[in-house]
């Protein structure tokens, strides 16, 4: 699908210079002299190289339509993560570095969304929130209730985050997987 250069938004995948690029940052610039343009930071989906390009409003680029499919996480084998297509039951193997730091949040049976272009995986989305157990947390210090302070904690998957002082080791909490931040404590009632 063809779009104008000023319609490129972060997250769009475009075909440029013979390969696929994802728009990371976009900045619409309207100089006092000359025509408006869109300053776009692009990242190559194959090798990860970055490129800064200017697209005039009048020029057109090819926006690539990605297919989104749900997969279930099965297991990790070395550096490979194995997923199963929820419709065809075919297995997909991705390298751990493809998922990045968020791979630590993968749990057995978790449903993730994989973005595909011509059956080739380009991106993966985990659920926005996951429930994890705190492995270690510093004890709360008395008198710290006046200010809203947070203390460091280590989750069962090894990720370090900041939690409120009332949260203790062994408790289950909900974490935002995009920002790696504490959301709330899981209630005991279920």
From Swiss-Prot:
One GO BP: peptide biosynthetic process
GO molecular function: translation elongation factor activity
Subcellular location as annotated: Cytoplasm
SMART domains referenced in this protein's UniProt entry, alphabetically: EFP, Elong-fact-P_C
Major localization class: cytoplasm
Keyword set includes Aminoacyl-tRNA synthetase: no
One GO CC term on file: cytoplasm
Highest taxon above the source species: Bacteria
Keyword list, A-Z: Cytoplasm, Elongation factor, Protein biosynthesis
Pathway: Protein biosynthesis; polypeptide chain elongation
Keyword Protein biosynthesis: yes
Family membership: Belongs to the elongation factor P family.
UniProt function note: Involved in peptide bond synthesis. Stimulates efficient translation and peptide-bond synthesis on native or reconstituted 70S ribosomes in vitro. Probably functions indirectly by altering the affinity of the ribosome for aminoacyl-tRNA, thus increasing their reactivity as acceptors for peptidyl transferase.
Name of the featured protein: Elongation factor P
Organism name: Bartonella bacilliformis (strain ATCC 35685 / KC583 / Herrer 020/F12,63)
Gene giving rise to this polypeptide: efp
């Amino acid at each position: 699908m063809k779009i104008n250069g000023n319609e490129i938004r972060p997250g769009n995948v475009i075909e440029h210079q013979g390969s696929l690029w994802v728009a990371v940052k976009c900045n619409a610039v309207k100089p006092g002299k000359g025509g408006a343009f869109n300053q776009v930071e692009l990242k190559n989906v194959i090798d990860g190289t970055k490129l800064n390009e200017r697209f005039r409003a009048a020029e057109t680029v090819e926006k690539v339509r990605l297919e989104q499919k749900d997969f279930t996480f099965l297991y990790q084998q070395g550096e490979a993560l194995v997923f199963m297509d929820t419709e065809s039951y075919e297995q997909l193997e991705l390298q751990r570095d493809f998922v990045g730091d968020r791979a630590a949040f993968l749990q057995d049976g978790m449903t993730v969304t994989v973005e595909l272009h011509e059956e080739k995986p380009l991106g993966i989305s985990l659920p926005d929130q996951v429930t994890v157990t705190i492995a270690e947390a510093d004890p709360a210090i008395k008198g710290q209730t006046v200010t809203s302070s947070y203390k460091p904690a280590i989750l069962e998957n090894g990720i370090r985050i900041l939690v409120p002082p009332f949260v203790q080791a062994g408790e289950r909490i909900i974490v935002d997987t995009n920002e790696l931040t504490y959301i709330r404590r899981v209630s005991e009632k279920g």
